[in-house]
């Protein structure tokens, strides 16, 4: 009795460990709506794999963050294009001066309260800057394209994670059905043993062994149910649904074909890698970032070139102390006396003559306070300026920027190479895992077929009193364990094959 329970519990623990370890693909952490909108409610009806993927793509926070990052890069690109345009700024001030102050228009000291305004418009256009503006646009454009590929990568990762969680849930459901059938078989066996015990055909220990086996099978159902609940919760959280939706969450369970136990799974790894490298967004994003880093080198080298800018401004102003001359009429002509020197005495004093000269007519003016718009129009000043800056010595900033840009290119090139290497290794690992799962399925299938016959023979011998309960339970538990291995190997192969199909550009479907 003790031996049976120990072996049964050991196999149950091993089965649970295998169940937990199946489909050990990286799963995204549950997305929560902390500080944001509440999680979306789950729709009614069973979920299909495609429906789950579509819903996750629409509600996943990582995908949203990738989209926002791309929008930010697009805004940066737009701004860099606008940098080619001239700048234009308007300025205006209003000032009150009290006491003895300089009149801002006459530049004379005056002891009065003066209100003044200054208005200006400045514009600047960069004519040449070592092609830095254009290289900035090209670099930002590449960064934006890479961020779009990041969105696709986030969507692909999420789709694979949803497919993994979906298959994990289907696996748990099938294990529950398998264990429930064992419970039904054990219940029938207990009933038969009770009849045989009353007839005196078997000992009471056989009934106790049958009841022990029934309890063990029921425990396996509970374990499988708990695993199913965990798998369902993982999928619900991955979809960013509220945790309370797990109680009513159901998935569509299609009839999945068993792996071919005869023909080995074959795949052209080189062709699969080339297809994946040409289609997967993470590879393209890495290549775009290498190109962006190269543009960064050109951008940094542009700091060696002179900078030529065109600057223009228009200024004007108003002062409350400003005045304007107003014509009040013509004055009488001025009479100018005429003096004459004595030619015999050149050094003598000139004498007044009887002649006179009429001078020019002088206009009479008076000064009145000047109006605001009159002063604004009269005080306009204009400036046009070319500015040339030639870098000579700036603390090795340009040289350092170039060195950093070169290093950044090397870093991004290594990342691109690492991305391709990781992709190749992932394909090779998925292929090896798929082959191993197929072989495990074939072995488990043969084992189930053999143990099914062995368990039937053991059941006949047990019912006839020719086999004790311990040996019968061992035979039954061996079959249960083999059936669990077969189911897990089946779903492991299906997932690995779907991953490889995905690398070949095929959609995720069951």
Where are the regions that the model predicts?
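Acidic, low-complexity, intrinsically disordered peripheral segments
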Residues: 2-17, 29-42, 98, 243, ...
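Bacterial Sec-pathway N-terminal export signals of envelope proteins
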Residues: 30-93, 99, 252-298, 391-392, ...
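Small/polar, glycine/serine/threonine/aspartate-rich low-complexity segments that form flexible
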Residues: 34-45, 91-125, 255-264, 298, ...
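Sec/SRP-type N-terminal targeting helices
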Residues: 64-68, 81, 113, 127-155, ...
């Amino acid at each position: 009795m003790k031996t049976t329970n120990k072996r049964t519990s050991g196999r149950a623990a091993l089965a649970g460990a295998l169940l937990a370890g199946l489909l050990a693909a990286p799963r995204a952490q549950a997305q929560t709506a902390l500080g944001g909108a509440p999680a979306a409610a789950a729709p009614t009806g069973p979920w299909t794999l495609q429906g789950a993927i579509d819903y996750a793509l629409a509600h996943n926070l990582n995908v949203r963050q990738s989209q926002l990052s791309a929008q930010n890069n697009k805004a940066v690109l737009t701004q860099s294009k606008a940098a080619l345009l001239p700048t234009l700024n308007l300025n205006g001030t209003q000032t009150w001066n009290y006491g003895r102050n300089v009149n801002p228009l006459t530049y004379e000291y005056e002891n009065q309260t003066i209100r003044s305004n200054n208005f200006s418009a400045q514009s600047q256009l960069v004519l040449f800057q070592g092609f830095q503006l254009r290289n900035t646009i090209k670099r930002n454009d590449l960064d934006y394209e890479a961020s779009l590929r990041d969105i696709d990568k986030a969507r692909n990762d999420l789709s694979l994670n949803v497919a993994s969680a979906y298959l994990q849930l289907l696996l748990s459901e099938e294990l529950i059905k398998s264990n429930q059938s064992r419970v039904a078989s054990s219940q029938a066996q207990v009933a038969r043993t009770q009849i045989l015990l009353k007839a005196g055909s078997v000992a009471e220990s056989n009934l106790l062994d049958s009841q022990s086996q029934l309890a063990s099978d029921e425990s396996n159902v509970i374990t499988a149910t708990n695993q199913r609940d965990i798998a369902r919760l993982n999928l619900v959280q991955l979809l960013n649904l509220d945790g309370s939706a797990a109680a009513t969450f159901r998935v569509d369970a299609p009839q999945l074909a068993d792996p071919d136990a005869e023909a080995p799974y074959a795949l052209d790894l080189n062709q699969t890698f080339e297809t994946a490298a040409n289609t997967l967004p993470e590879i393209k994003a890495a290549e775009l970032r290498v190109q962006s880093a190269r543009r960064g080198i050109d951008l940094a080298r542009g700091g060696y070139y002179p900078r030529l800018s065109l600057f223009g401004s228009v200024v004007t102003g108003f002062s409350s102390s400003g005045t304007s001359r107003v014509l009040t009429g013509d004055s009488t002509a001025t009479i100018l006396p005429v003096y004459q020197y004595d030619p015999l005495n050149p050094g003598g004093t000139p004498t007044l003559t009887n002649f006179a000269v009429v001078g020019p007519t002088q206009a009479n003016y008076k000064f009145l306070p000047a109006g605001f718009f009159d002063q604004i129009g009269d005080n306009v000043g204009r400036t046009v300026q070319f500015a040339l800056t030639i870098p000579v010595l700036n603390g090795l900033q340009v040289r350092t920027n170039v060195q950093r840009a070169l290093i950044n290119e090397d870093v991004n090139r290594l990342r691109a190479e690492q991305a391709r290497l990781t992709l190749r290794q992932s394909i090779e690992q998925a292929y090896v895992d798929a082959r191993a799962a197929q072989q495990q399925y074939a072995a488990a299938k043969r084992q189930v077929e053999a143990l099914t016959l062995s368990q039937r023979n053991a059941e006949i011998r047990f019912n006839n009193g020719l086999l004790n309960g311990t040996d019968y339970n061992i035979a039954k538990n061996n079959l249960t364990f083999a059936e669990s291995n077969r189911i897990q190997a089946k779903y492991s192969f299906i997932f690995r094959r779907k991953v490889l199909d995905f690398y070949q550009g095929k959609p995720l479907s069951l």
